[in-house]
C-alpha cells in the first residue's frame, strides 16, 4: 500500500517541480489582464472567488503552448438569489506568464460568443473579400442610381447594415454587436407596417437593369453560391440535428429525446482538445457524435432532411455531412425559385427577376446557407404559400409547415387566415383551417413511432417549447440581467410588454385593413416576423432569411419596368 501511495505521488510531485508559476501568481496575472479587469470592475469584491488549477498537458492548453498552463476561474455570488456563477475564465501559459485565453461574461458559457473565425458559414463568407462583393452586387442590381438619396436606397442599406453587428459578433464583442441589431430591425418593421397599412408601393424610378440581365446574374450567383457551399462551408449543430432526426425517423424511431448524447455511454472516438469525447455508442448500437439538445425544433425540421438522408446517408459522425449540404442547397434554390414565381405573378417580369436576384445576392441568405442550418426551410413554405395566396387551403398548409419547422411563423396565422378579407363566408376560413390541420397531423405523425402518442406529445413539449421558452441567451437585450453586472439593465418586463403588443398586433392586422392586397400581405407578414424576432431571447443573424423574402417584396414592389416604345 505504501508503494502504491508513493507511486501516485510521483506524477504530482514531478508536475509541481516543473511549474514556473505559483497558483497565486497565475491568478494575479489573469486578474491583471485588461479585458478581465474591465469586466470584474462591474462586480463588488465581496462575493468574488478566484481559483486556478495547473494543467501539465500542453494539448489541453491554448495552441502554441510548449509546457503546461493554468486554468483560472472567477465566480461571484451575492446570495442564493443573486448568483452570477463563473464571470471570467481563461488560461495562463506557465512558461511565458502570458494570458493566452481570457473569456468574460457571455463568452464563459457560450463558445460561439468568443469570435472563432468561420464558426458560422466557414471562413470565406465571413471574410471581407467575399462579404463586401455580395453587398456591392446587391446594391448594384437593386439601387436607384438616378436618385441616390431615395427611400429605396435607404431600405437596401438598412438590409445590409446587419453586417456591422455581425462584424462585432465575429470578433467576440457581444455587448456591441447585439444592440446594433435593433436599429435596422425597428426601421424595417416601421417600413413594413407603413406599407402594409397604406397599401401603396414604394415610389421608385425606372429600374436600371432589364429582367433578363438580373435573372442571368442571379443564375450565375446561385451557381457560385452552390460551389462556395460545397467548397468552404461548415455544418453547425442545427444542421447536424436535421440529419440525426431524419435517420431516427427512417429507422422507425421518434426523434425527440432520442438524440445522440454523451452521459456515461461507452466512448468510440478520440477526445478533443478540451478532453471531451463526443463519439459514443448510442441506444441503437451505433457510434454517433453527441448532439443532445438538437431535438428542440418542430417535426418538419427533421422531415425536411429525409430526401437528403436517403440520397447521401449519414455515417453517424459529425463529419462533412453531405446530406445536410444537399438539403441546404435544395431549400436555398427553392426559396429563390418561389420568390421568382411570386414576383412574376404579382408584379411582372422585372419584380420576379429582381426577387430572385435579391435572394441570390443578399449576403445573409448565403451566410445561412453556408452555415447549413434549417433556417432556409422556415421561409420556403411561406414563400410558396404566398405565391398561392388566393388558395386558403395552400395558405393553411404553408403556415403549418413553416411554423412546425421553427415556431415563429405561427404568428402570421391570423393574418393569413383572414386574407384577403373581409370575412363574410366561413368557407375560406374552413379551407385554411383544414389545410393547417392536415399538414399538422401529417407532420406530427412521427410521434406515432413512439408507440405511446400521449407520452410522446409530452416529450415533444418538454424538448421543444419548454426548452425554447426557458432558455437563457446573451444574443438579445432581454436576458443580460443573468450576469448581475453593474451597468447592464434587467429588461425582462419590457420584453413581456413587447410580447403582449406583438400578439395584439397579430390579431389587429388580421382585420385591419379590412381588405388586403398581396403587397399588404407581404408587408404585414414581414412586420410580424420581424416583430417576433425583436422579442426573441435567443436571436441570430441566421434568422434574417425568415423575414427577408417578404420585406424585399414589399420594398421592391413599386418598381415597374418601362414599357418599350411602340414602333
Give short role names for the model-derived ranges:
Residues 1-17, 214-224:
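Hydrophobic secretory-pathway targeting helix
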Residues 396-402, 408-419, 543-546:
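Transmembrane-embedded, aromatic-rich helix segments that form part
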Amino acid at each position: 500500500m505504501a508503494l502504491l501511495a508513493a507511486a501516485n505521488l510521483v506524477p504530482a510531485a514531478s508536475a509541481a517541480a516543473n511549474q514556473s508559476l505559483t497558483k497565486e501568481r497565475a491568478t494575479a496575472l489573469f486578474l491583471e489582464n485588461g479585458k478581465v479587469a474591465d469586466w470584474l470592475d462591474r462586480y463588488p469584491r465581496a462575493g468574488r472567488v478566484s481559483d486556478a488549477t495547473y494543467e501539465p498537458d500542453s494539448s489541453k492548453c491554448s495552441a502554441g503552448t510548449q509546457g503546461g498552463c493554468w486554468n483560472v476561474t472567477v465566480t461571484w455570488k451575492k446570495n442564493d438569489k443573486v448568483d452570477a456563477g463563473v464571470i471570467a475564465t481563461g488560461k495562463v501559459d506557465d512558461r511565458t506568464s502570458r494570458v493566452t485565453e481570457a473569456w468574460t461574461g457571455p463568452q464563459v458559457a457560450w463558445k460561439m460568443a468568443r469570435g472563432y473565425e468561420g464558426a458560422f458559414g466557414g471562413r470565406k463568407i465571413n471574410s471581407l473579400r467575399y462579404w463586401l462583393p455580395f453587398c456591392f452586387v446587391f446594391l448594384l442590381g437593386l439601387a436607384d442610381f438616378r436618385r441616390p438619396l431615395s427611400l429605396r436606397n435607404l431600405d437596401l442599406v438598412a438590409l445590409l447594415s446587419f453586417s456591422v453587428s455581425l462584424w462585432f459578433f465575429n470578433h467576440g464583442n457581444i455587448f456591441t454587436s447585439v444592440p446594433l441589431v435593433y436599429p435596422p430591425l425597428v426601421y424595417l418593421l416601421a417600413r413594413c407596417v407603413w406599407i402594409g397599412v397604406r397599401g401603396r408601393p414604394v415610389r421608385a424610378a425606372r429600374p436600371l437593369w432589364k429582367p433578363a440581365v438580373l435573372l442571368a446574374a442571379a443564375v450565375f450567383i446561385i451557381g457560385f453560391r452552390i460551389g462556395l457551399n460545397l467548397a468552404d462551408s461548415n455544418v453547425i449543430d442545427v444542421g447536424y440535428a436535421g440529419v440525426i432526426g431524419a435517420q431516427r425517423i427512417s429507422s422507425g424511431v421518434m426523434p425527440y429525446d432520442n438524440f445522440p448524447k454523451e452521459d456515461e455511454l461507452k466512448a468510440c472516438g478520440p477526445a478533443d482538445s478540451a478532453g471531451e469525447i463526443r463519439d459514443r455508442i448510442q441506444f441503437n448500437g451505433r457510434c454517433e457524435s453527441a448532439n443532445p439538445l438538437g431535438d428542440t425544433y418542430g417535426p418538419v425540421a427533421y422531415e425536411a432532411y429525409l430526401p437528403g438522408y436517403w440520397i447521401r446517408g449519414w455515417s453517424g459522425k459529425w463529419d462533412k455531412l453531405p446530406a445536410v449540404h444537399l438539403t441546404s442547397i435544395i431549400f436555398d434554390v427553392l426559396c429563390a425559385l418561389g420568390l421568382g414565381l411570386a414576383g412574376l405573378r404579382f408584379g411582372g417580369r422585372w419584380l420576379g427577376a429582381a426577387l430572385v436576384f435579391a435572394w441570390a445576392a443578399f449576403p445573409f441568405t448565403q451566410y445561412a446557407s453556408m452555415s447549413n442550418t434549417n433556417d432556409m426551410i422556415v421561409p420556403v413554405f411561406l414563400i410558396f404559400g404566398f405565391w398561392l395566396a388566393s388558395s386558403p387551403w395552400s395558405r393553411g398548409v404553408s403556415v403549418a409547415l413553416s411554423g412546425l419547422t421553427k415556431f415563429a411563423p405561427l404568428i402570421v396565422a391570423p393574418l393569413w387566415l383572414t386574407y384577403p378579407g373581409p370575412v363574410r363566408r366561413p368557407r375560406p376560413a374552413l379551407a385554411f383551417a383544414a389545410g393547417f390541420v392536415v399538414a399538422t397531423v401529417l407532420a406530427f405523425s412521427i410521434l406515432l413511432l413512439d408507440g405511446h402518442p400521449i407520452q410522446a406529445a409530452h416529450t415533444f413539449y418538454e424538448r421543444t417549447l419548454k426548452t425554447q421558452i426557458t432558455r437563457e441567451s446573451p444574443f438579445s437585450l432581454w436576458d443580460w440581467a443573468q450576469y448581475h453586472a453593474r451597468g447592464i439593465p434587467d429588461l425582462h418586463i419590457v420584453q413581456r410588454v413587447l410580447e403582449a403588443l406583438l400578439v395584439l398586433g397579430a390579431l389587429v392586422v388580421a382585420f385591419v385593413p379590412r381588405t388586403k392586397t398581396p403587397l399588404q400581405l407581404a408587408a404585414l407578414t414581414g412586420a410580424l416576423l420581424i416583430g417576433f424576432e425583436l422579442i426573441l431571447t435567443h436571436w441570430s443573424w441566421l434568422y434574417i432569411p425568415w423575414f427577408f423574402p417578404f420585406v424585399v417584396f414589399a420594398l421592391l414592389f413599386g418598381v415597374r419596368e418601362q414599357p418599350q416604345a411602340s414602333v
